[in-house]
Design a protein with these regions (language model features):
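Gly/Ser/Thr-rich active-site cleft segment
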Residues: 1-24, 28-32
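Active-site core segments that coordinate phosphate-bearing ligands/cofactors
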Residues: 22-187, 195-208
Length: 208
């Protein structure tokens, strides 16, 4: 872009003090918003985290990058943290739920959405990581196709999406355990998805 170098400061690590403002130290953040969210979590050493937003990030703080073939094949990445590496995976998140709500019940609140979802006894689910759910013209139609059925009630689609996400999280935790040779007893969840009680309960069940 031919930008002059004077526009840029020197490279520095996260948490480096760069100045003060009205007596308050100004520090560099942890590279970006999600990294900063992870840094702000009270995560015990050796326990995984899940940033549950439109897209979900599930991972673990590790001392150094993990770059074996399993990690590459499973789309696990290594990103900078504050004195550690975030070994994590970008997976489907509330995008499924938000798109279905927007399409099937745009006027209801999320409190009403959660109540509707709880009222359904539907047990069908899809592979939340399937590429057909990334940007479908109709999320409902995408679910119909993968579930191989039509005519479900709105609450059934909602519950199916929640079940599907929990199973995706469970699968990713098992991959993380295998890749790091560890067994986890706790999962820390932050973000909007942390407010979905049914999703939390099903995630607890799927992750053991």
């Amino acid at each position: 872009l031919s930008l002059p170098s004077r526009l840029f400061t020197s490279l520095a690590k996260p948490k480096t003090k760069v100045g003060e403002y009205k007596g308050v130290d100004v520090l560099l953040c942890a590279t970006h918003d999600t990294a900063s969210a992870v840094e702000g979590m009270n995560v015990e050493e050796g326990e995984p985290y899940l940033s549950s937003g439109t897209w979900s990030l599930l991972g673990l703080k590790v001392p150094s990058p993990i770059t074996d073939e399993k990690s590459m094949e499973g789309n696990w990445s290594n990103e900078g943290g504050v004195g550690y590496t975030r070994y994590q995976k970008n997976i489907m998140g509330m995008w499924l739920i938000n798109r279905l709500k927007e399409e099937l019940a745009p006027s209801i609140t999320f409190t009403e959405f959660n109540a509707l979802t709880e009222s359904s006894s539907f047990t069908g689910y899809v592979d939340a990581e399937d590429s057909s759910f990334l940007s479908p013209e109709s999320m409902k139609d995408a679910f119909d196709h993968k579930l191989n059925r039509e005519g479900l009630k709105a609450e059934d689609y909602f519950r199916s999406a929640v079940i599907s996400l929990s199973k995706s999280y469970g699968k990713s935790i098992r991959e993380l355990e295998e890749n790091t040779k560890r067994r986890f007893n706790r999962l820390y969840i932050v973000g909007g998805g942390a407010n979905n009680e049914l999703l939390n309960r099903l995630t607890e069940k799927e992750t053991g």
